[in-house]
Every structure is written in C-alpha cells, then in structure tokens.
Amino acid sequence: MSLRNQLLGAFAYVLLLIIVALEVPLALNLARRIDAEVKNEAASQAFIVAANASGQMGNLAELRKLARSSGRTLGARVIVVGPPPNGRLLADSTVAAPPNTPYASRPEIARALQGFRVQGERHSDTLGQDLLYTAVPVTNNGKVVGVARVTQSLSAVHSRIRRGVLALV
C-alpha cells in the first residue's frame, strides 16, 4: 500500500471521528429541544382548553363539546374536572370514564386544583402505553374552579425525536 493511500485512509478515519464527535452532542441536544418543545406545546394546549372552559363550568353540554373538539384537534385525550374538593369528571373527549368519576385523588389533578401546572410522564396499564400528561387549573375571577388535563401518547413524541435525530445522520 502506497504512502498516499495510507494518508488518505488516515485522513478519512480522522474525518469520520470528527463527524461522529460533533454529531453525537448535536443529536442529544436536538432530542432535548424537541422534547422540551413538545412539552411546552402540550402545556399551551392545556391552558387554551382551560381558558375556554373557564366560563363554561356550569354548562356540561358546552364542556363536553369543548373536550371532544379539543381532543380531535389535538389528537389527545382531554378531560375537564370540576372544582375542589370533589374534583369530579365533568367532560371527557373519550368515553373512557363515566361522568362524575372522582379525579381529585389523582396526583396531577390534586396539584392542579391547588393552582399549579403539572406535567409528567407515566405508564397507563389500561392503555398499555406511556403517556405525557399536562394538568392546569381552570380559573374564574382568580379562583380555581376546575382542572383541564391533556393526555397524549409518548410514542408520537418519541417518533418525532427519532425523525429529528435521523435527519442529522
């Protein structure tokens, strides 16, 4: 093998190492950014549902229509829960739970009923998949009158991250 071929091989190897060394941190950063973007988008969606539900908490027909239309638009499950202390289900974009099911004991609902935004990931044994949930308080004149929760599958989030990382490669 000639010296020229050895130098070209060494140059190609060093170039490959440089590309990999730059690509890995970039891919990790991109994955974190996409994850943060998806979570911020979910929070925005939950706040929009809460704002729309604010003046409708006494009108169950309108709340149910809001939950169904929001669920279709967002491709997520949307629920609206009534005021503390009971925190009963008022509207659901699916028919997963009957109306008046108590939700106040669920950690994310209990925290949102205290006025906090709650977001996290958990596994649903019922659905057999991992979920991203976002629960926000529904307020009216500064008082918490309920909770809006948006729940979406994490498989869609993970596939979006995967597509973004693969686009780099």
Regions found by a protein language model. Name each.
Residues 1-27, 169:
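Extreme N-terminal signal-anchor transmembrane helix of membrane signaling/transducer proteins, especially
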Residues 33-40, 99-107, 152, 160, ...:
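Residues at secondary-structure transition points
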